Amino acid sequence: MLPTYERFSDPKSVLFRLPFARLALVALSLPLGGFFFCVIWSLTFDFVRSTYTHCDVTNYLPSVSAAIGNYEPQKTVWRLAIFLHLPLRLAVAKIYLEHYREHIRRSRRLLGILACFLNVVEDLALFCLSFWTSADHYETHRNAFVVFIACSECYMLVSYLLNRNIQKTVLLPHEEKSLRYKRNLFLVNVIAFGLAGYCFVRHNSHCEAGVYTFFALFEYIVVLTNMGFHMTSYWDFYALNVVCDAKHGLYLSQS
């Protein structure tokens, strides 16, 4: 059974209709493109400044915060990407909430609400840490980052559990594929986050050459696996359309 809602609206009342795959690709391509632009631009044109460390040891990669938030035009490009993709991410969170209400067991629907809450808070925290940078607003940026990471890790775990064992129906092949990617991306994300934390502490304690480079590399993996996890919505809602009409609001439909 495809994850779709049995709602049929008057075609004349439909405000828009588009394939969910297109929505998912746009929602991912904005931050993904912005991230790669910021890193590549920093390495090409701001290498010395973006890779500088407080103890001036050898470093070859900018941290995520340095790449996206410290210099222009990277700061503006990243903020624009996050600003434009936020409504799409919130729309996807709303679609997931409706999906969980429709397709998971009634006794577990609080988990669906929790997943939606974590997803929304993660999105808002990402917005905050992008617009309040570490260079200009360190405490706000730090707190937003902590909230982002906590909600991100919890959301990935809850989302995986929701899709693994509390569905009402047997999973279809594309849903099983999504589940495998969720599991693998979550595990890589957690491992990379742990290694990034280790490298950060070691760098601050010993100031060894190259350690901050590994910290930045593991940061990149955390960012990319987070984006990849959210991209699994492509398979969760395979071959469906996102429809918005005046009566039902935003929902999924096969028609």
UniProtKB/Swiss-Prot annotation:
GO terms for biological process: GPI anchor biosynthetic process. One of its GO terms (cellular component) is endoplasmic reticulum membrane. Keywords: Endoplasmic reticulum, Golgi apparatus, GPI-anchor biosynthesis, Membrane, Transmembrane, Transmembrane helix. The keyword Endoplasmic reticulum applies. InterPro entries: Frag1/DRAM/Sfk1, PGAP2. It is a multi-pass membrane protein. It is found in: Golgi apparatus membrane; Endoplasmic reticulum membrane. The chain crosses the membrane at residues 23-43, 111-131, 143-163, 185-205, 209-229. The keyword Membrane applies. Its main location: Golgi. PANTHER family: FGF RECEPTOR ACTIVATING PROTEIN 1, POST-GPI ATTACHMENT TO PROTEINS FACTOR 2. Belongs to the PGAP2 family. Involved in the lipid remodeling steps of GPI-anchor maturation. Required for stable expression of GPI-anchored proteins at the cell surface. This is Post-GPI attachment to proteins factor 2. It comes from Drosophila melanogaster. The lineage of its organism: Eukaryota, Metazoa, Ecdysozoa, Arthropoda, Hexapoda.
